[in-house]
Design a protein with these regions (language model features):
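Hydrophobic anchor at the beta1->P-loop junction of P-loop NTPases
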Residues: 33
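Small-molecule kinase domains that catalyze NTP-dependent phosphoryl transfer to phosphate-bearing small molecules
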Residues: 141-198
Length: 198
């Protein structure tokens, strides 16, 4: 009985090992796009989602907070728990997850820290470092739900987060070049990982 029990226990342990190992093997990549209102984050996020293809999840701060939940923004915004759960889902089930929004560092730092905890070195963060005048110019080329006065009120100069290793996106870069840069960054790391695993 002891030998049979040992064999069964060993088999169960082996099955659990491979199941857990399989779960750990899948770790999606997270792209974070931050910056002031009107800088073009959403446009880039949607274009990047199409470029990356199926199984790419797009988490838009405005969509979650304003449209889905209709809650106020702030340090303890009720959007944070749902955005955190979406990051967890993306890590386990999506090849790529894109998180985009203004997301002031002061208010969303806990979310960025969670992103690092979940995705580790698979976090690719970009900050749209544009002048106020440039964001207004870009905003005026689209359908406007708000104006320059609101944008001035929301404005935060160079709100880089020390919780993220953010690369700066400047006004010289258009949507296509930004998408290509991010795509190139993702592929460069993918090739390096494949080389190291040989």
């Amino acid at each position: 009985v002891g030998i049979k029990s040992c064999k069964i226990d060993c088999t169960v342990i082996k099955i659990l090992y491979f199941v857990l190992k399989g779960k750990k093997q899948h770790m999606g990549k997270l792209i974070i796009l931050r910056g002031n209102s009107g800088s073009g984050k959403t446009t880039v996020a949607k274009a990047l989602q199409k470029k990356l293809g199926r199984n790419t999840m797009l988490i838009s701060q405005d969509e979650v907070r304003r449209n889905m939940l209709w809650v106020d923004d702030g340090i303890d915004t009720k959007a944070l728990p749902l955005m955190a759960e979406l990051l967890r889902y993306g890590r386990e089930h999506s090849e790529f997850s894109i998180l985009e929004g203004i997301m002031y560092d002061e208010w969303y730092r806990s979310l960025f820290e969670l992103a690092n905890e979940l995705y580790g070195s698979n976090v690719y963060a970009y900050y749209f470092d544009l002048s106020f005048e440039e964001t207004v110019r870009r905003h005026n080329t689209r359908n406007r739900e708000f104006g320059e006065k609101d944008m001035r009120r929301w404005w935060r100069e160079k709100d880089f987060s020390s919780a993220l290793r953010e690369q700066a996106i400047t006004c010289e870069m258009d949507t296509d070049s930004i998408v290509e840069k991010i795509y190139s960054d993702l592929n460069a790391d993918r090739k390096a990982t494949a080389f190291m695993s040989k």
